[in-house]
Amino acid sequence: MSLVYLLIAILVIMAMILLMSKRRALAKYAGYIALVAPVISSIYFLIQIPSVAKLQYLSTSIPWIKTLDINLDLRLDGLSLMFSLIISLIGIAVFFYATQYLSSRKDNLPRFYFYLTLFMFSMIGIVLSDNTILMYIFWELTSVSSFLLISYWYNNGDSQFGAIQSFMITVFGGLALLVGFIMLYIMTGTNNITDILGQADHIKNHGLFIPMIFMFLLGAFTKSAQFPFHIWLPRAMAAPTPVSAYLHSATMVKAGIFLLLRFTPLLGLSNMYIYIVTFVGLITMLFGSITALKQWDLKGILAYSTISQLGMIMAMVGIGGGYAQHQQDAIASIYVFVLFGALFHLMNHAIFKCALFMGVGILDHEAGSRDIRILSGMRQLFPKMNLVMTIAALSMAGVPFLNGFLSKEMFLDALTQTGQLSQFSLISMIAIVFVGVIASIFTFTYALYMVKEVFWTKYDSKVFTKKNIHEPWLFSLPSLILMVLVPVIFFVPNIFGKGIIVPALRGVSGGNHQIDPLAPHVSQWHGFNIPLLLTIIIILLGSVLAIKVDWKKVFTGKIRQISVSKGYEMVYRHFEKFATKRFKRVMQDRLNQYIIMTLGIFMIIIGYGYIRIGLPKVHQLHVSEFGALEIILAIVTVTIGISLIFIRQRLTMVILNGVIGFVVTLFFIAMKAPDLALTQLVVETITTILFIVSFSRLPNVPRSNANKKREIIKISVSLLMALIVVSLIFITQQTDGLSSISDFYLKADKLTGGKNIVNAILGDFRALDTLFEGLVLIITGLGIYTLLNYQDRRGQDERE
């Protein structure tokens, strides 16, 4: 099956979900219909594993806008396959979990599942895209769909603010990324990603290479919540828990990491890129791990833990980026080891983080709270969630016999090996190891502290008073399955490593299959070495900090109020006030003012063009024959037009405006265009009558007195627009480079059977345009009728 067919299948499912929204009896089954989408995509991508492992990549290219090299280019290689599997398989768990989490009585299920399926569709689109502009479209589609999901409970103020904040930051990054893609097109002349990566050596010497890297980093850092662009992610917790579980584990926050991995063969050629990504990742990891301890809300703890874990993965992506420079060197194996660790931890993080969010969702759903000050001793009431969240949290902390331990060991090993890499000095290595270890200690601390406070403290019935707590099996099933995978991957890591991660490494390297022998064999035991020693230190210090320190009392008062997001909120409020003032100044409910502003901007643009290229030069002007009638009609039109500026009576203005229309009708008659004259006459008559009739229903508000300054502006704008239109006519007459389409119409109108050229254009050459114009009028009429009918019924209901 083609990749396009897969995307179409998902779109069909989305359409079915929308149709179900019209029938309330079927709406409760929307989740199960939506579940088909991740199931189909999972089966499809699982089937492709053997082919991709044998270097048999799928690709599809459908021409779209050829002149701009924008095509529907899709490609399934090892990297896109790994991300697609994570998106799809985690999607099955999340979609099923959502069917148990949401209520068909309280929630609009078709709307929710449409948004969620759109979210999955856009993420799969990103990882399959082999065209930069197509990737950008899907990139922004994730921002739009996440906005809709975060604001799903739109009556909640936190949901509204969180949705706006995430949308503003990620769209800003997306626009920066688009600029980077345009720079790539300027440097290479193509939008095809495979072709771009093939020109990496040429691009690195271009003057736009460094600016392009910064644009890419802005896009990646905003999407993957790297410091200081992380602030949108905790606010996104206002979304329903299934959304949080999906967003944090498998979708949007991983898009930035995917972007950097996909373009590693190009971006890794710059040492500056390696430094920035490595140190921003480590700072984000440290900041997220410390800030997680400030939180009382379980979702808040997990949000900052995601920020920290993303920083950890990002740091490994940065260190491993040097492979682009040293593919044939002896140290290439170190870079490959680090990239393998990044991909391995990305997969592990998706599993344990999704399980953690599902556990928190069940606690919130059944206990009615996520506050660790209220929840205590929950192991008695939630034995299954105690097991799920404890194992998942310990995996995140890097405890042995769980999958997180293996990838955390690879992370520590990568840090200690940076001293052997040419990009890092001894001082850099010491700083990297120090920050990484401190961040890992706090990671262990918040993971252990979270489960200790919720499950392993003494149950206090005075604080937590809710009764009749239960854990439905179907509700718990997805998180239990994910929990089982945590130790399973620890014992059989190479099944996933050889079948999924190694092919993904080929994608990171730009399709270089020679990377396979350099890929590490994951072992549970490496003997006593520096990473193991660091792990022991992390576990000991982290345990002490988690058990002995009451972090609820540490971050209090002014310390708790310190937040990076406060700066964003302050800037946002100032911009909002500024925008409101400007809006009120510009939008004064005066149609003529809007027209003047619109035409003014248009004239500025045209005027700038004339300044750059010079005024049009008239070599030979072809003027149609005209007589006394045309001169008289022109004088009448101009005279009436000028008089309209000074007349105060509205009825007189409407009548004179109609007179201008009738004069235009006479122009058409003089030009021997009876069809146009008849059409103009009918339209002008109806319009004038409607204007006059409408006055009987409007209040008799006198027109404001003439303002000399305002009238001068109106006359000036009118005259300038007239000059611009005339100059454009001159330009078109002087242009000989392109053949006129009029000749085609004149030669082909006989074939249409029309009586004249106008009939032929409207009825044949522009038949679809005419059809859709009619449809627009019909839809507009139906919309007006619906609004009027709604208002009538509403007024009737209020009277009753």
From Swiss-Prot:
Pfam families: MbhD (PF13244), MbhE (PF20501), Proton_antipo_M (PF00361), Proton_antipo_N (PF00662). GO terms for molecular function: antiporter activity. Keywords: Antiport, Cell membrane, Ion transport, Membrane, Transmembrane, Transmembrane helix, Transport. It is found in: Cell membrane. The chain crosses the membrane at residues 1-21, 33-53, 78-98, 118-138, 167-187, 207-227, 241-261, 273-293, 300-320, 331-351, 387-407, 424-444, 472-492, 527-547, 595-615, 627-647, 651-671, 676-696, 712-732, 768-788. Its main location: membrane. GO terms for biological process: monoatomic ion transport. PANTHER family: NA(+)/H(+) ANTIPORTER SUBUNIT, NA(+)_H(+) ANTIPORTER SUBUNIT A. May form a heterooligomeric complex that consists of seven subunits: mnhA2, mnhB2, mnhC2, mnhD2, mnhE2, mnhF2 and mnhG2. Belongs to the CPA3 antiporters (TC 2.A.63) subunit A family. This is Putative antiporter subunit mnhA2. The lineage of its organism: Bacteria, Bacillati, Bacillota, Bacilli, Bacillales.
